[in-house]
Each structure stands twice: as C-alpha cells, then as structure tokens.
UniProtKB/Swiss-Prot annotation:
Chain sites annotated for binding [4Fe-4S] cluster: C47, C50, C53, C59
Cofactor list: FMN; [4Fe-4S] cluster
Free-text cofactor note: Binds 1 FMN per subunit.
Function: Redox-active protein probably involved in electron transport.
InterPro entries, alphabetized: Flavoprotein-like_sf, FMN_Rdtase-like_dom, ISF_SsuE-like
Protein name (Swiss-Prot/TrEMBL): Iron-sulfur flavoprotein MJ1083
GO molecular function: 4 iron, 4 sulfur cluster binding; metal ion binding; oxidoreductase activity
Family note: Belongs to the SsuE family. Isf subfamily.
Subunit record text: Homodimer.
Length: 193
C-alpha cells in the first residue's frame, strides 16, 4: 500500500508542504508507505488543448508531469495540497490537474482514495473552495473522496499561514491534516483488504 502527497505550492518549504507532510506522517504511522512530491521544483507546462492524449493516451509535452502521473497511477491514495489562490488551487497544481487527462482515459485513478489540503492567509480564506476544487478533480477521475477524520471531520486539512512556517503554530490546521492522513489510511486499508 502506498499514498503519495503532492504539494502544489510554488514554495518548496511553505505551509502547504508542511501540512501535506503532516498528513503523510499520520499515514506512515499506520504502516503505509508514503512519498512526498513538491511541484515547486518541477518543470510543469500547461495543457495546450491538442487532444493528442485522447488519440495516443499520452501527453506529447515533455516535462515532469508524465513521471508524476505515473506515480499517481501506481498509488493507492493521493493527497493533493494547495495554497489558496483567489479561492482555488495554485497554477502549479492546476497544470498537473489539467494534464492528468491521459489518466482519465479508462479511469485509471478509479477507486483510489483522495484527500485534500489547503492553506489560506486567514481562517476563512478560501480553504474550503480550494478543497472543493480538488474534490471535484478526484470525483471526475472516479476516485473515492475523503475528508479529515473525527473529531474534526470536515473537508480535509485546512491551514492558516501567510509566511512560510506559520502553520507550525496552527494547531487546528495541523490537527485537520493529521486527521485527513488517518482517514486516507483507514479507507486505503479497507479497500486493500
């Protein structure tokens, strides 16, 4: 069993990275292998709408996206994290989401467990709408969407932070990220029985 966590932040060591890693640590404590991927240091290019992925099952753009999609396909669970950008995901994560179209052919992510993390500059700073965008992505890929586990049990990991490292002091954000990891681990184990 394996879960990958992808931070869509342009900052390699920002608050989104911190919360995605927090969720992955909770998953690892449940005996599941984890891998962290930061999009900050990846070469990512936008979809150009050429439809080659529909014809050939693979995107013709040569960058780091293909390797990430391969890891998503091989994983049992996927956590996607993003800072809030105008109520939605970062450009980096949106490029990965848009370029995942080859995996939708044949629904290659079907029944994988998906969880979301979002970090905003204030407590009600668009985290839930950003998570909703990630959940929509999971649903379109026919994945199983989970939120954070009890006792918080909402949409996913929701952090507050402006400067890198601020989330270290966000007890609620850390708790929701850990609870998300526990829920992803729980459902992955149920599916893999």
């Amino acid at each position: 069993m394996k879960v990958i966590g992808i931070s869509g932040s342009p900052r390699p060591e920002g608050n989104t990275t911190l919360l995605v890693r927090e969720a992955l640590n909770a998953i690892a404590e449940e005996g599941i292998e984890t891998e962290f991927i930061s999009l900050a240091d990846k070469e990512l290019n936008p979809c150009i709408g050429c439809n080659m992925c529909k014809e050939e099952g693979k995107c013709p753009i040569i960058d780091d996206v293909d390797e990430i999609l391969k890891k998503m396909k091989e994983a049992d669970g996927i956590i996607l994290g993003s800072p809030v950008y105008f109520g939605g995901v970062s450009a980096q994560l949106k490029m990965l989401m848009d370029r995942s179209r080859p995996l939708r052919i044949g629904f290659q992510l079907r029944n994988k467990v998906g969880g979301a993390v979002a970090v905003g500059a204030s407590r009600n700073g668009g985290q839930e709408t950003t998570i909703q965008q990630i959940h929509n992505f999971f649903l379109i890929h026919s994945m199983i969407v989970v939120g954070d586990n009890d006792p918080t049990a909402h949409y996913g990991g929701t952090g507050v932070g402006k400067a890198p490292g601020d989330c270290k002091n966000d007890d609620i954000g850390l708790e929701t990220a850990r609870n998300l990891g526990k829920k992803v681990a729980e459902v992955v184990k149920l599916i893999k029985k």
